[in-house]
C-alpha cells in the first residue's frame, strides 16, 4: 500500500511535468509566461465538499500512529480558549475552506515582471508567494501561519514550495500537521477556472503525502471581507486545556456507528484512502439515509 501511495505521488508529479512540457511557454524555454493568477475567485467546492467534518472523521487522511493518536485526543472546546479564538487558518488548510479568494500581484516597477503573488481569504494572514528567486530562510528561522513560499514556472503552471509553517490542522477536527511539514502547490488556470493542488509532506504525523485539490471560478463581484477579532473569556476553568485521554473520546464511538466502521477497522490512516476500504463498512441508519438517526447513543 505504501508503494502504491508513493507511486500516486510520482505519477501526479510526472503528469504535471508532462502537462507543463506541452505548453507553449515550456516549448519556448519558459520565456514569455503569460498566465495571470491575479483576480477575485469563488470556490467551487472541494473534492471533499465543505470542510466541516464530524469529530472523529479522519477518513482519507494518511495519518500515521502518532498523527492518529494526536487527532483522537482533540476536544472541540479547545477552540474556546482565547489563544485559539482569533487564530488564522494556515497555508496547508485554508484553500479548502468555503470563502472567497483574492490573489493580488506585485510587479517590479523597473522590469515590469511579477515578483510575488499575495493570496488572501477570509480569516487568513499574510501569505506572500515569491517569484524573485530569493533565498529560503534557514531552518531555525521563525515559523508563521503562511510560512515561506517561493515559486517557479513549469510551463504555464506555477509550482510553489512552502516551508516554515506553524503546526496547524489539515482537517478541522483535530487532524494536524506539525511545524516540520512542507507543502508543494500547483496553480493551474484553464480560462476562468483555477485548480489548486496541494501535496503535504509531514515526517511526524503523516505516513504518506496528503494530496488534495480545490477548484475556484473567476468572478467580478466577490468580496474578501475584513476579519476583526477580539478574544473573550468563555467560562473555561483557568489553566485548563481541553483534551481527551487516549481511548476516552466518546465521539469516536459515534463516528463508527454513523458509518458502520467495525471495531477492528481504522477511522484514519493510509488504508482509509483507497476504495477497498469502503467495502469493509457496514450499513447503518445514517448511510441508509436516516439523517435523524440517534447515532451512538
Regions found by a protein language model. Give the residues of each.
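Bacterial N-terminal signal peptides that target proteins for export
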Residues: 1-11
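Bacterial N-terminal signal peptides
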Residues: 9-19
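PEST-like low-complexity, intrinsically disordered acidic/proline/serine-rich tracts
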Residues: 24-297
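Active-site bordering "gate/hinge" segments
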Residues: 3, 14, 101-103
Amino acid at each position: 500500500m505504501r508503494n502504491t501511495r508513493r507511486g500516486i505521488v510520482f505519477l501526479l508529479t510526472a503528469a504535471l511535468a508532462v502537462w507543463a512540457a506541452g505548453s507553449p511557454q515550456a516549448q519556448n524555454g519558459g520565456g514569455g509566461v503569460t498566465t495571470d493568477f491575479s483576480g477575485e475567485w469563488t470556490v467551487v467546492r472541494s473534492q471533499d465538499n465543505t470542510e466541516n467534518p464530524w469529530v472523529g472523521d479522519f477518513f482519507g487522511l494518511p495519518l500515521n500512529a502518532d498523527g492518529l493518536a494526536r487527532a483522537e485526543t482533540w476536544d472541540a472546546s479547545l477552540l474556546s480558549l482565547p489563544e485559539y479564538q482569533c487564530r488564522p487558518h494556515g497555508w496547508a488548510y485554508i484553500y479548502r475552506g468555503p470563502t472567497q479568494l483574492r490573489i493580488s500581484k506585485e510587479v517590479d516597477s523597473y522590469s515590469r515582471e511579477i515578483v510575488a503573488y499575495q493570496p488572501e481569504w477570509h480569516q487568513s494572514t499574510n501569505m506572500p508567494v515569491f517569484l524573485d528567486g530569493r533565498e529560503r530562510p534557514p531552518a531555525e528561522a521563525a515559523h508563521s501561519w503562511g510560512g515561506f513560499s517561493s515559486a517557479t514556472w513549469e510551463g504555464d503552471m506555477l509550482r510553489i514550495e512552502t516551508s516554515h509553517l506553524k503546526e496547524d490542522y489539515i482537517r478541522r477536527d483535530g487532524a494536524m500537521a506539525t511545524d516540520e511539514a512542507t507543502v508543494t502547490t500547483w496553480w493551474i488556470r484553464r480560462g476562468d477556472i483555477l485548480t489548486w493542488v496541494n501535496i503535504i509532506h509531514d515526517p511526524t504525523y503523516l505516513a504518506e503525502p496528503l494530496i488534495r485539490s480545490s477548484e475556484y471560478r473567476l468572478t467580478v463581484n466577490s468580496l474578501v471581507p475584513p476579519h476583526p477579532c477580539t478574544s473573550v473569556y468563555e467560562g473555561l476553568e483557568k489553566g485548563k486545556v481541553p483534551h481527551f485521554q487516549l481511548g476516552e473520546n466518546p465521539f469516536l464511538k459515534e463516528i463508527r456507528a454513523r458509518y458502520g466502521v467495525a471495531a477492528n477497522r481504522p477511522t484514519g490512516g493510509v488504508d482509509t484512502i483507497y476504495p477497498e476500504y469502503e467495502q469493509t463498512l457496514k450499513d447503518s441508519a445514517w448511510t441508509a439515509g436516516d439523517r435523524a438517526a440517534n447515532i451512538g447513543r
